Amino acid sequence: VTVLLIFLVNYILLSIGLYLVFPKIGVEAWKGLVPGINFVECCKAIGRPSWWAVLLLVPIINFFIYAGIMIPFVKSFGKMKWVESFLSVVFPIGILYPIANDDKVKHTGQYYAKEQAYKAELEKVRKSGDKREYNKLVNNNPYHKTVGREWVESIVFAVFAAAFIRMFLMEAFMIPTPSMEGSLNVGDYLFVSKTRYGMRTPMTVAQIPLLHNRVPGLGTESYLKKPNLPYFRFPAFESIDRNDPIVFNWPVGDSVYISPSRSWTVGQIERDPNIAKRDRALGKLVKKKNFAVRPIDKKDHYIKRCVGAPGDSIQVINRQVYLNGEPGENPEHLQYLYNVTFSTSSINTRNWSDWGIAESDVYGGGKANTYIIFLDEEQKAKLKTLDPNVSIEHRPQETDGNKLFPHNTQYYGGWTVDDYGPVWIPKKGATIELTPQNIAMYYRTIQVYEQNEVSKQGSKLVINGEVADTYTFKQDYYWAMGDNRHNSEDSRAWGFVPHDHIVGKPMFIFFSTREGSMSKGINWDRIFTSASNR
């Protein structure tokens, strides 16, 4: 609301400024107050076609159009300084009012049209080979800018354009963890489309360009929480399908301790205080309760595979995902953790890296011929070529319901990452009956993601001051899991991905380093390959 009010006030002041200035260009003052007509007259005054004003209605490009109208407009009154151009875009009344009240300031004609005519004449003379006339035109250039100003304007435009593209259209991401290993590897750099699933407009508007949520080296957040905008998403070009890799904001990342190694939620530390004891830097933050509270679009970015869609019932039985009672489709390079025992200790590990088995994927098993390794089926087959008698067995996973969503050992204490669920994924418009058991499952969803006032009254849930026996969900949710199933912190750990947290769809890998290090080489075979069809 605050931001909209600022825009509204600024537009009203702009209209007043045009009302005061229009008589100087021979236009009735009242036209400056009429939306649409005022910009049509500005276009005429600078020599732009009138239809340019219509482009102000087109999202994304309208800011460039606005700047392309207002900057030449004030220049047509001889206001050539950089600060005057800046004011014409950011706070136009700050330059329009002085223009209107200075009798010495006159309209010099259609600035844009005259500038284009000059450039056309200059190009014509250059092609003719008349150096004398060309030098004369250059020396008498009425639109000359200093080298410093040219650089400043170029840098400002480049930064703004890059930030604009990153904010609305496409963003580059680097895979930092092995949770999608085999499909998307540590060191993969990829572009993510922000329009395929519907472009989400920024909610946090005051931010440092080209930074997501932290200022490198300073350890501070790169944005201000206020002013902000409400959630809005443009229509999607395609829906999110099961097994699509998706990029999203970490749903539980609204209150986080940020250590040098990673971010930890306040809830994670409360459930397992030993985490802070193992990390000295984190321990200091926890002791001071120095955690960051982040809005939706400034939570950390995660990339996982959408394995469950809205309305699905999902369950993991002996590592296999089941959707609505049927086995789900498995990714080609699905990985698990295995106990690997070779029949001999003289095993050649030289090719392991070429097979996609990174150093970080391998742990010692306590004996010279024993390893604990994250592997997919293809890698298992290659290990067997080294030793036909090798033993490769699934490594059992611990039972700790407190570490797994919904963190309730009373009802869900026997779950593991390999035997999990069933869980019903909320769907927009669907209504559920609230029970003591599923309240634990959907409490955060109803309270935080759906923005309700929620409390417990015995075994009942009180929503917005009223005891509720049922609840109807306001948006869709998804279930996301990493392909590296035993090395992925995903929906099994923190639950549902709300639709308003969806950032975009991975498109293609534009660069890839081996195991995330340039010193280990470049994965040339991964560059310019699809990031979604894996």
Segments from the language model and where they lie:
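Feature marks short, highly hydrophobic, charge-poor N-terminal signal-anchor/signal peptide-like helices
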Residues: 1-6
